């Protein structure tokens, strides 16, 4: 069964919409195989987003991701990567379709409520970043 990583970002955690977001996953056939609430260190955020290191938004992204706790989850289901990306909506909430997580809960392109793996290969890497195999059920 396909797995993907989801991060509920600090803006959505602060707003108290964790349960509403998790319900979207479960209501659409994604099972929560692992989950934890963590406060990322600057080093962890830099390592997780290392692929964006040379991009102009990197510093702001890292600062945002350490501004409060996040909820990381492993979602499992048929076509989990694409299904999660469809549920999240466009990166910019102004462009996200009505009814998507970002359209409903995101503030801006920076504070956009959620992160989701963009491929099966990255899902594997991202899941291993946060979870040991014995933490996924």
Curated annotation (Swiss-Prot):
Keywords carried by this UniProt record: ATP-binding, Cytoplasm, Kinase, Magnesium, Metal-binding, Nucleotide metabolism, Nucleotide-binding, Phosphoprotein, Transferase
Organism: Campylobacter jejuni subsp. doylei (strain ATCC BAA-1458 / RM4099 / 269.97)
Keyword Lipid metabolism: no
A Pfam match: NDK
Residue runs in coiled coils: none
Cellular component per GO, a single term: cytoplasm
InterPro entries reported for this sequence: NDK-like_dom, NDK-like_dom_sf, Nucleoside_diP_kinase, Nucleoside_diP_kinase_AS
Family: Belongs to the NDK family.
Name of the protein described by the UniProt record: Nucleoside diphosphate kinase
NCBIfam families: PRK00668.1
Gene Ontology biological process: CTP biosynthetic process; GTP biosynthetic process; UTP biosynthetic process
Binding site for ATP: 9, 57, 85, 91, 102, 112
Lineage start: Bacteria, Pseudomonadati, Campylobacterota, Epsilonproteobacteria, Campylobacterales
Molecular functions (GO terms): ATP binding; metal ion binding; nucleoside diphosphate kinase activity
Keyword ATP-binding recorded: yes
Oligomeric and partner information: Homotetramer.
Location(s) in or outside the cell: Cytoplasm
Superkingdom: Bacteria
Cofactor needs: Mg(2+)
UniProt EC number: 2.7.4.6
Predominant location category: cytoplasm
Function: Major role in the synthesis of nucleoside triphosphates other than ATP. The ATP gamma phosphate is transferred to the NDP beta phosphate via a ping-pong mechanism, using a phosphorylated active-site intermediate.
Active site: 115 (pros-phosphohistidine intermediate)
Record field: catalytic activity: a 2'-deoxyribonucleoside 5'-diphosphate + ATP = a 2'-deoxyribonucleoside 5'-triphosphate + ADP; a ribonucleoside 5'-diphosphate + ATP = a ribonucleoside 5'-triphosphate + ADP
